Amino acid sequence: MTVRAVIQGCGHYLPKRVVDNSEFERTLDTSDDWISSRSGIKRRHFANEDETTSVMATLAAKEALADANLRADDIDAIILATSTSDLTFPSAATMVQANLGIVKGFAYDVKAVCAGFVFALANANALIISGQAKKILVIGSETFSKLMDWEDRSTCVLFGDGAGAVILSA
């Protein structure tokens, strides 16, 4: 019998602070029209000081667990895609693992910027197909607002903060 991976549950977390393009007009040589015509972006969410990458990832993970009707200890592994970890080490994935109270399995980060979640999902799929895990929490979480150059209009208008999570199951 062929093992297939399916998405069993999903969740997300967006910080409360919403920043629309007009806020950038005050500090940069730009306009809502310039930003939206080039990027399609009208608004983005920015994390506050307490909303770290691992905190947002944990909140998205809890929502995914609830959506899948699973408990945290049902999870065999966590793969977290991020380029904005809270610390150099430990990995953000192990911080989420601890936040959820998971004491078994493995957890690691994937750092591939925009493609990170896709790579994390591909990793999880391969682990499930190979029989190494049955339920994997795959998360993408970023806090780019904490490291952006606020004077570079070509980049600072593009990024926001948030987290999304899925549970991939055999």
For the regions a language model picked out, list residue spans one by one.
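Conserved catalytic cysteine-centered active-site region
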Residues: 36-55, 82-136
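N-terminal Rossmann-like NAD(P) cofactor-binding module of classical short-chain dehydrogenase/reductase
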Residues: 79
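Conserved "HGTGT" condensation-loop signature of ketosynthase/thiolase-family condensing enzymes
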Residues: 1-76, 100
